Design a protein with these regions (language model features):
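Short, charged interaction patches at domain edges and termini
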Residues: 1-10, 40-53, 93-130
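Non-transmembrane, interaction-prone segments in cytosolic or luminal domains
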Residues: 29-30, 61, 96
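Conserved beta-strand segments that form the floor/walls of ligand-binding pockets within enzyme
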Residues: 36, 59, 117
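Short beta-strand-to-loop capping motifs
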Residues: 60-64, 120-122
Length: 130
């Protein structure tokens, strides 16, 4: 399995521990709040799958009345990502983490949209210090 897919899968597993989570943007029948494991960027430092940096974006959507729940989800995910050390044969360390809280008016009702950008350093088959 590639490092990109490994980290994506582990990230989705962590999201599903917190709430309703998808690996695609669900249609309008999904209940709010929900999490969506989305875009990813892989910076391959060695031109192999041995070492690199992976940026994973996670989206949290909810109604305006879900603000407290969304903030709790974001906090729990931050802690879970910080603790993540392994993903399907790769060792991980979270190296960067940013969030944005956005107003989203694409639905009939106004929504809150949290965008979490998480960077992981990965190595294959060796333990990371830390």
């Amino acid at each position: 399995m590639t490092p990109t897919h490994s980290i994506f899968r582990q990230t989705l597993i962590e999201c599903k521990k917190i709430g309703d989570a998808y690996d695609y943007l669900p249609n309008g029948s999904a209940n709010y709040p929900f999490l969506y494991t989305g875009e990813m960027i892989n910076t391959d430092n060695s031109h192999s799958d041995m070492v690199g940096t992976m940026n994973q974006t996670v989206h949290l959507y909810g109604r305006l009345s879900d603000r407290k729940t969304l903030m709790e989800y974001e906090s729990k995910l931050h802690d879970a990502f910080k603790r993540m050390r392994h993903a399907f044969g790769y060792n991980l360390s979270m190296t960067d983490y940013t969030t944005q809280l956005l107003q989203d008016n694409t639905d009939i009702q106004p929504l809150l949209h949290i965008v979490m950008d998480v960077s992981f350093m990965y190595t294959k088959g060796e333990q990371l210090n830390g």
